[in-house]
């Protein structure tokens, strides 16, 4: 083995919960410019906690904005392929910011408080880029960046409702998937959304720093296990949720990334629309697929996929997951190899393993 | 988790340990390495009878987080391979100094080759600073 360099931690940003993480024995690693907890106990234990009961994540590194003004809806409609005009107050939409070439600038969630008032949550590593893009393309919109003043916690798992219910003043059973509300949480205001990145039921909770720290402390003291980025990655991959910068970036369009479901084909003009229409008509040359891999070795980011001697694709994310207990991966493959059931070989550091294109997600929770 | 470094072993800065038994040496990875790797899911090792050379890769150890090469701390012939650990790599994580050993090697030259090892105390200072 070789000693691995973890980079210069001193240049990294820390969330307001960093002291809590250290106190809980977290191993901290650099992630997208932030020093973040990788795990507190073990990745497998944290993963299973979220699948079977509940787990708590600090995701305060994510970008958090509010957009307000009379003309907000018309302006944000130009930036995304989803029809945000369909949203009622209290509803949210996962979508992508597109550039003029239909390349994905980021994936993000727009939460509609009202047509004049939106909450937007974006990836931590792309926060600066997104903020610049929005500033450049939104006129007359009041933009408020909450990233530095607010925490964001994710409480995820089948026991999330019963865990959180005693702390809030609304009936959580009445808050549907992807719905959100302004609530009183332990007597303080909080933004509560039934969203997440694990494939489980759960909530994302945004509040001012002191309230976020208090919530973290009260939940962990009550026995909710804190979970790190390691479990977050295996959970999201089982649910076939994409990681920006790894499974998609500005060189991929939503159709190539198998995110066609976020596109409303009838909505008015937006960046990249002509290119998406052309791709829809002609099909894309490559697309993101799910793979299962034979054996126990993990097909990791960057590993090549082969049909005989011809390289026909590349792995973007891979892991061996606690729930499915076999190697799974996301990969871009050429059109002929995208259908379910296609057989390919993945080059794992010089050795070939058979891989099969399978239906995504790899894991789906029982409803 | 409190990490242990048994006194009777010799340690490499690449996080392998050596248990010297006459002219044979048992090679494994330290509890520090195991702790850094996290859940171990796969290990590839040489075959019995293979010749390994000091400094060369003799296999790899893989966790969900990362893959690390295993480097031979000495030159010799592989006498036996821990096939139980190959079948159940979690054993390396749960018992690195016992049932989770990796290979047993007969030294090519018993008089040589073990010069650059550390004692348990030196290794502890190195990894825990």
Swiss-Prot record, chain B:
The keyword Disulfide bond does not apply. It comes from Gloeobacter violaceus (strain ATCC 29082 / PCC 7421). Residues 24-106 form the Lipoyl-binding domain. GO terms for biological process: glycine decarboxylation via glycine cleavage system. InterPro entries: 2-oxoA_DH_lipoyl-BS, Biotin_lipoyl, GCV_H, GCV_H/Fam206, GCV_H_sub, Single_hybrid_motif. Binds 1 lipoyl cofactor covalently. This is Glycine cleavage system H protein. The modification N6-lipoyllysine is found at residue 65.
């Amino acid at each position: 083995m070789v000693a691995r360099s973890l980079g210069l931690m001193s240049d990294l940003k820390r969330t307001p919960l960093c002291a809590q993480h250290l106190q809980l024995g977290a191993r901290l690693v650099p992630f997208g410019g932030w020093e973040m907890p990788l795990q507190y106990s073990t990745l497998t234990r944290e993963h299973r906690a979220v699948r079977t009961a509940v787990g708590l994540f600090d995701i305060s590194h994510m970008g958090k904005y509010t957009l307000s003004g009379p003309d907000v809806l018309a302006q944000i409609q130009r930036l995304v392929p989803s029809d945000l005009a369909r949203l009622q107050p209290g509803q949210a939409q996962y979508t992508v910011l597109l550039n003029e070439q239909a390349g994905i600038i980021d994936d993000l969630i727009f939460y509609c408080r009202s047509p004049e008032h939106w909450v937007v949550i974006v990836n931590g590593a792309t926060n600066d880029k997104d903020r610049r893009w929005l500033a450049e393309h939104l006129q007359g919109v009041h933009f408020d960046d909450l990233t530095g003043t607010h925490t964001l916690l994710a409480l995820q798992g089948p026991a999330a409702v019963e865990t959180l219910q005693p702390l809030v003043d609304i009936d959580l059973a009445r808050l549907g998937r992807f719905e959100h509300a302004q609530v009183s949480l332990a007597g303080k205001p909080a933004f509560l959304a039934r969203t997440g990145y694990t494939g489980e039921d759960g909530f994302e909770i945004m509040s001012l720093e002191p309230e976020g720290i208090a919530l973290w402390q009260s939940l962990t003291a009550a026995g909710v296990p804190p979970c790190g980025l390691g479990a977050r990655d295996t959970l999201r991959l089982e649910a076939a949720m994409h990681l920006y910068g790894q499974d998609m970036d500005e060189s991929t369009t939503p159709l190539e990334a198998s995110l066609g479901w976020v596109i409303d084909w009838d909505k008015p003009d937006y960046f990249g629309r002509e290119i998406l229409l052309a791709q829809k008509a002609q099909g894309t040359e490559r697309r993101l697929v799910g793979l299962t891999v034979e054996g126990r070795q993990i097909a990791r980011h960057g590993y090549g996929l082969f049909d005989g001697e011809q390289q026909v694709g590349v792995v973007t994310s891979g892991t061996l997951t606690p729930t499915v207990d076999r190697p799974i991966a996301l990969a871009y493959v050429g059109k002929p190899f995208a259908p379910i059931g296609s057989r390919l070989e993945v080059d794992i550091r010089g050795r070939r393993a058979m891989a099969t294109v399978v239906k995504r997600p790899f894991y789906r929770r029982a409803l | 988790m409190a990490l242990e470094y048994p006194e009777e072993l010799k340690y490499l800065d690449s996080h392998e340990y050596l248990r010297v038994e006459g002219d044979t040496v048992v090679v494994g990875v330290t509890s520090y390495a195991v702790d850094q790797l996290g859940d171990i899911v796969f290990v590839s090792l040489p075959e019995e009878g293979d010749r390994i050379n000091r400094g060369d890769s003799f296999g790899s150890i893989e966790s969900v987080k990362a893959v690390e090469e295993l480097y031979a701390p000495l030159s010799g012939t592989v006498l036996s391979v821990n096939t139980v650990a190959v079948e159940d790599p979690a054993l390396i994580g749960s018992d690195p100094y016992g049932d989770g050993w990796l290979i047993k090697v007969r030294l090519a030259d018993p008089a040589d080759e073990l010069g650059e090892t550390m004692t348990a105390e030196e290794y502890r200072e190195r990894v825990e600073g």
